[in-house]
Curated annotation (Swiss-Prot):
Descriptive protein name: Protein GrpE
Free-text function comment from the UniProt entry: Participates actively in the response to hyperosmotic and heat shock by preventing the aggregation of stress-denatured proteins, in association with DnaK and GrpE. It is the nucleotide exchange factor for DnaK and may function as a thermosensor. Unfolded proteins bind initially to DnaJ; upon interaction with the DnaJ-bound protein, DnaK hydrolyzes its bound ATP, resulting in the formation of a stable complex. GrpE releases ADP from DnaK; ATP binding to DnaK triggers the release of the substrate protein, thus completing the reaction cycle.
Ranges in a coiled coil: none
Family: Belongs to the GrpE family.
MF terms (GO), sorted A to Z: adenyl-nucleotide exchange factor activity; protein homodimerization activity; protein-folding chaperone binding; unfolded protein binding
Species of origin: Leptospira interrogans serogroup Icterohaemorrhagiae serovar Lai (strain 56601)
UniProt subcellular location: Cytoplasm
Species lineage: Bacteria, Pseudomonadati, Spirochaetota, Spirochaetia, Leptospirales
Gene: grpE
Length: 212
């Protein structure tokens, strides 16, 4: 009986040993499978991360190019707008010049005639009030023109300026160190507003020049 019991115990021990070995093998297989799955998962995640980074990098480069394109486009638009403003300003100045010249030129000849009358020397008691009246009218004309930024100028004694004067005659002499206006046949007019100034009618003058 004791021997049978020992044999049974021995068989159970062997069976348990085999079972333990089998379980160990199963556990090892499971661990290997889990390890492989974990490795595959890690590799997959790494690949997905790399793909995501590549995609983001591509999008970033595309966004940079688009920003540069927009900056270039904005710079061109701004330059075109500045050119448009400059052209518009130049055109406006040109139109205004022509408008002022056209308006003022219609008054200049009558004013010249009145000036000749006003400069008349007379001892006649009958004509004197008339001449004085013309002089007063001229002063009113000058005042109206000045309020409109139109200035009359008589450059006698000043250096000759070909931009605002027209020399109709000249003489040479040792007394002249430079070209100088010695007589004015007809006064000139210019328009001046802030820094904007241009000649409406050049003064017609006689000049003195150094001997050549």
């Amino acid at each position: 009986m004791a021997e049978m019991s020992n044999n049974k115990t021995s068989e159970e021990a062997k069976a348990n040993g085999k079972k333990s070995q089998s379980e160990t093998l199963e556990e090892s297989k499971l661990e290997n499978m889990n390890s492989e799955e974990s490795t595959e998962t890690t590799q997959t995640e790494s690949m997905e991360t790399a793909e995501t980074e590549t995609s983001l990098q591509t999008e970033l480069e595309s966004a940079k190019k688009e920003i540069e394109s927009l900056k270039d486009s904005w710079a061109r638009e701004r330059a075109e707008f500045q050119n448009f403003k400059r052209r518009s300003a130049q055109e406006f100045v040109s139109i205004r010049k022509e408008a002022v010249k056209s308006l003022v030129s219609g008054f200049l000849n009558p004013i010249d005639n009145l000036e000749r009358v006003g400069a008349t020397q007379t001892n006649s008691e009958e004509l004197k009030p008339f001449v004085d009246g013309v002089t007063m009218i001229l002063k009113e004309f000058y005042s109206v023109l000045e309020k409109s930024n139109v200035i009359r100028f008589d450059p006698k004694g000043e250096p000759f300026d070909p931009m605002s004067m027209e020399a109709l005659s000249s003489e040479e002499g040792d007394q002249y160190s430079e070209e100088t206006v010695i007589d004015v046949y007809q006064p000139g007019y210019y328009y001046k507003e802030n820094e904007d100034k241009f000649t409406l009618r050049p003064a017609r003058v006689r000049i003195g020049k150094p001997k050549s």
